[in-house]
């Protein structure tokens, strides 16, 4: 079932060498609520800005897919020159999609201070340059952030009807 995802997005994940990555931390959160409401809240367009204000230190407040700014275009062009795919891509049914986003405020990683979470090590063949965040979604239940120094994976799973 993952072949279409791998075929379309493998060029995004390959430079990160995720198959060789180690799990540094794992958390399980059980929300005692109607899972449909939890899901809808999570996918709400303004969820991150309202629920996670600390993300605004490094993550763009709006990644709506609107026309990129000149700075964003330069960032994408530089990433492509480094052999790192940047263009927004998606499946025909929008089940999965990926894009590379430029981090804000000079951040190099999605951490509280914007500095790399893992110092002195890069994932796969990531260069020392700021490679931004590859944001990968597989709807409806999985989203991931791949950064130069670490990757984050989130999965939602209803436990009851």
Segment roles from a protein language model:
Residues 2-161:
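C-terminal catalytic domain of Rieske-type non-heme iron oxygenases
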């Amino acid at each position: 079932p993952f072949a279409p995802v791998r075929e379309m997005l493998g060029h995004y994940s390959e430079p990160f060498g995720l198959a060789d990555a180690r799990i540094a931390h794992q958390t399980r959160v059980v929300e005692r609520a109607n899972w449909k409401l939890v899901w809808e809240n999570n996918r709400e367009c303004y969820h991150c800005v309202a629920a996670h204000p600390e993300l605004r230190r490094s993550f763009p407040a709006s990644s709506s897919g609107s026309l990129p700014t000149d700075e964003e275009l330069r960032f994408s062009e530089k990433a492509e020159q480094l052999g790192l795919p940047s263009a927004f891509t998606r499946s025909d049914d929008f089940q999965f999609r990926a894009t590379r986003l430029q981090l804000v405020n000079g951040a190099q990683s999605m951490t509280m201070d914007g500095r790399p979470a893992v110092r002195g090590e890069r994932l796969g063949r990531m260069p020392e340059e700021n490679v931004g965040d590859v944001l990968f979604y597989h709807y409806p239940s999985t989203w991931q952030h791949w950064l130069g120094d670490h990757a984050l994976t989130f999965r939602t799973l209803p436990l009851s009807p």
